[in-house]
Amino acid sequence: MRKKFVSILLMAALLSLIAISFANADTFGQVLDRWTKSRKYIGEDKLSNLEIKATYYSAEFIEAYIQKEAEANLWTQQEADDYKYKFLSALKLDEMIPIQIEFNNNAETMYMGPFDIMAKLTIKNKAYKPVDYDKRLNFKFQGKKEGLVYFPRYDEKTGKDLLEGVKTVTLELRSAIAPTITKGQPIKFLWDVSNDDPQKLYQGKTAARVETDRLLKRLEKLRKDKAEEEAKLKAINDA
């Protein structure tokens, strides 16, 4: 009787874990849907087609993705924290706005290079060019291709957060990447970012490590600036 009771408890626990796993999977799917926008074009021949997806890497999306990976790989808290730190560092989230773009091109060959003149992010009626992007996006292709594109998070002159008080942002791709199937119309994706708060990601050990990295970068920049000023002063004195 006792063995049977224990078996029932174990089965109940297992079913609970499975239920939680599926619930989390559904939650990630819902989060992904919220932050992924798509556009699909069908050619006049009704056969050729182009689908473009763009995923805005919001705090909600990143947190849900990390949680999904942690559960799928059965990571410890330390392993999850390490992955989060590396993931955030790779995304350059403290400096830039990352957007993942996916193409599934079953139409004309696409020519997208140089990609930094093909894309722009509009924030408060001002357009910003990519500051970095996956260079594979420069090459012509048919079929599937994807890559991350990074836009500035702070004003270059004032250092102000460009997303402060902003409700929406719009990613626009020029029609030149696929002029025939888009009929010369730009491709646009709009996100509501009013409730996005990347600072939520920087908590606990992750926050401490990121802050240390930031300070080290700052010190390195100060050293570089000092060296440049000393070189200028020396040039003046030697003149």
Q: What are the language-model segments listed below?
A:
Residues 9-18:
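Bacterial N-terminal signal peptides
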